[in-house]
Amino acid sequence: MSTTLGRELLEAARAPEFAGWLRGLRRRIHQHPELAFQEHRTSALVRAELDALGVAYVWPIAQTGVVATVAGAAGPGPVFALRADMDALPIQEMVEWEFKSLEDGKMHACGHDAHVAMLLVAAKLLQSRRDHFNGKVKLVFQPAEGGAGGYHVLKEGVLDDTQTIFAVHVATDLPAGVVGSRPGPFLAGSARFTATITGKGGHAAEPHLAVDPIVAASSAVLSLQQIVARETNPLQGAVVSVTTIKGGEAFNVIPESVTLGGTLRSMTTDGLSYLMNRIREVIEGQAAVNRCTAAVDFMEDKLRPYPATVNDEGMYAHAKAVAESMLGEANVTVSPMCMGAEDFGFYAQRIPAAFFGIGVGSNGNDGGGMAETTKNQLHSPHFVVDEEALPVGAAFHAAVAIEYLNKNASGRSA
């Protein structure tokens, strides 16, 4: 591995002409956030920038996605993929700054604007160094991370020839200039469920003439809590949370039915499948015990469950070594496992993958006139990005790809 490549790429990304372009890209995208599978303006911006760079691409992929290819001129080799998600969230931005969202009720509150901007600058860095690497780099500008867009990209076959894939996500718990991840399970698999428990409505003064679905639903909610407490390994994270419940409209009427729903999470995809099976069994069983019937729906057609994001050990070690060479060992951390979910898990199921957090915690250099150095959570209307992190992410993408391609083209182990 080159001991200087990462630092050279970072220096290039921090150069005034690069850094200004990078900030401008992120701010333009930030002002016009688009929801899942509606990223038409963002997709057009990506294609225009790729055209200007002379980078070939395929479009549309999964409705609004773009997959570009930078081919190394040093000879044949593996295919390495880099991915950035493009969608925003249905949140009203409450940060007052010059480049605030212009779209009512929509905001890039998860940093996907930064992801797209960093990958575009990585494309320029890669294009300018084509003579220095073998193989190909595919740049995946993916729609709808919040709508399983990664699953739909894979279905189209554009990554069938890819040997490995890498992506980053902004991390508010890390300062700019710091990156973090971990080997093995990193982010949880997730799914949602809804259930309808049906009994027999009647007068609340005569419960013996009714079949009460509220009692059945209450028993089901309590029993669901025992799945994690008594059936899962305490060293392997899992969550079952009932977050909605609705039944009845009047004080003196036992309703005909009750609906409830929630989310489930597991640090393994097998664990997620186990939770799904047990949730169905528990709800149906508690309904039957209370003389009711139940219909449980995991909404897999509309809200496809996300597999856990599991970092390939070799790819994690490779990306970590690149980061340490570029930023210094003190600025590369081992992150804890996180119950958040990411559709990058679909890629990691199919292709050896690594997923890293890029610190965007503000040190007063957010670049947008926001001097309050607060650390806001993802999905917050107050979310901000320290733009000093953007060149780090751009250079990290390019360095991870180039180093991997050259190591593997020369026959050495990744």
UniProtKB/Swiss-Prot annotation:
Q: What is its EC number?
A: 3.5.1.-
Enzyme class, UniProt record, top EC level:
hydrolase
Any stretches that span the bilayer, and where are they?
none
The source's superkingdom equals: Eukaryota
- Pfam annotation, one family: M20_dimer
Gene Ontology terms: biological process: auxin metabolic process
The UniProt keywords, alphabetically, are: Hydrolase, Signal
InterPro entries per the record? Amidohydrolase, Bact_exopeptidase_dim_dom, ILR1-like_Hyd, Peptidase_M20, Peptidase_M20_dimer
Q: Does the keyword Hydrolase apply?
A: yes
Keyword check for Transmembrane helix, yes or no: no
Q: Name one GO molecular function term.
A: IAA-Ala conjugate hydrolase activity
Q: What does this protein do?
A: Hydrolyzes certain amino acid conjugates of the plant growth regulator indole-3-acetic acid (IAA).
Classification via PANTHER family = IAA-AMINO ACID HYDROLASE ILR1-LIKE 3 (PTHR11014:SF99), PEPTIDASE M20 FAMILY MEMBER (PTHR11014)
Q: Which family does it belong to?
A: Belongs to the peptidase M20 family.
Its protein name is: IAA-amino acid hydrolase ILR1-like 4
Protein species of origin: Oryza sativa subsp. japonica (Rice)
